[in-house]
C-alpha cells in the first residue's frame, strides 16, 4: 500500500492518549455543567439526509455552498456527513416527538470541507446545547452556561463575550436591503467572496476577515437602526440579565452568525490567541428553525463550542490512576498472574498483564515506561510459596505478600494513593 495513503486524510488527524483525555475532560465538564442547567444528553447519527441541512442552513451559507460532504447511497438518497449539530437535533426533536421544553446536550464530530489550518480541520468536535421551547430569558441563561464552562476550564481570562441582536424578520429584511444598497456602491472594492455573498446574503459580508472588506464595513449601516420597539425591549432585557449575573460583555453591532436560521440574540465568546479562528463558543436564537422543518412554531436558543479550540487554550494534565503490572517469569506464573489480574480488576484496579516476561530487567523497564505504581513479580520460588514480590516503582522498595492477601494489599495501596492525590489537590487550591 502507498505510504501516503496510510496518512490521515487531509483535514483530519489522529488523537493520541493525552489529547483524548483532554477531549474527554472538556466533554465531561460540559456535560456536568449542562446537567446543572437541566440539560440531558442525546445523540444523532453522524450522517443525515441532505434535506435536513439544505432546508435549514440557507443557500447563502458557506456550508451549503462549498463545505458539505455529500454522497448518494445505494438506495438513491443523497446523504451528508453532518456539518453542524443544531439542525440534526431539531430533526430529532420533531421525529421523536420530544416534550417541550427540551434542553438537549450533544457532543461529537462534525465535518466541513474547509481549508485546513490551525484549529480548523475538516473533521472537528463540538459540545452543543439546544433549548427548545425557550423564552427570551433563556438567552442570558445559555450565555451563563457557556461562561461557567469557560470558568471550569480556567479560560475566562482568555475570552471576551460579544453580543448582538438581529431583531425580528422585519428587522433582518430591512437591514439586508440597506446593506445591499451600501455594498453595491463599493462592489468594485469588495473581495471575491464578498461579491459572491452580495448576491446571496449581504449580511454574511459582515463576517469577512478580508482587510479591504473590513475597511468598507466601517461605514456600513448597523442593524440596531432597524429594530422595532419589541426587538429593542427584548435585547435590552438580555443585557440587563447579563448585568444582573455579573457576566461581562460588549455589544458588537457587526456580529452576525454564519447560518440563515438565526434571529434575535446572537453571541460569540472570542479569543485573540487562535488567530483568525477566534470564536471559541458561539450561538444564538433560532425561533423559526423547527417550523422550517415542518415541526410547528418552537422558539429556541442554543450554542456550540469547538472542542479543538477549547483544548488549544485549556491547560490539562491527565492524572493517571493507580495501576499495577504483573511480571510472570514462567508459564505457571503467567497462569497465576492471569487469575490474580482478573480478581484485581474486579476490585476496580487498573492491571497490566502481558504474559511471560523473558527477562526481569526488561519487564521492569517496560513497567516503568507504562507508569505503573507496583510491579508484581511472580517466579517459580514465589509460586511455590504462594507469594508475590511487590516492587514499589517510585522507591524500589520490595515487599513479599501472600497471593491470598494480594487483593487487600493492592486495594489498600490504591486507597492511600487516592488520599494523597486529594490532599495534593486540596493543598494546591489553598
UniProtKB/Swiss-Prot annotation:
Its EC number is 6.1.1.21. GO terms for molecular function: ATP binding; histidine-tRNA ligase activity. Keywords: Aminoacyl-tRNA synthetase, ATP-binding, Cytoplasm, Ligase, Nucleotide-binding, Protein biosynthesis. Transmembrane segments: none annotated. Pfam families: HGTP_anticodon, tRNA-synt_His. One of its GO terms (biological process) is histidyl-tRNA aminoacylation. Its main location: cytoplasm. InterPro entries: aa-tRNA-synth_II, aa-tRNA-synth_II/BPL/LPL, Anticodon-bd, Anticodon-bd_dom_sf, His-tRNA-ligase, HisRS-like_core, HisRS/HisZ. GO terms for cellular component: cytoplasm. It is found in: Cytoplasm. It catalyses: tRNA(His) + L-histidine + ATP = L-histidyl-tRNA(His) + AMP + diphosphate + H(+). Belongs to the class-II aminoacyl-tRNA synthetase family. Homodimer. This is Histidine--tRNA ligase. The lineage of its organism: Bacteria, Pseudomonadati, Pseudomonadota, Alphaproteobacteria, Rickettsiales.
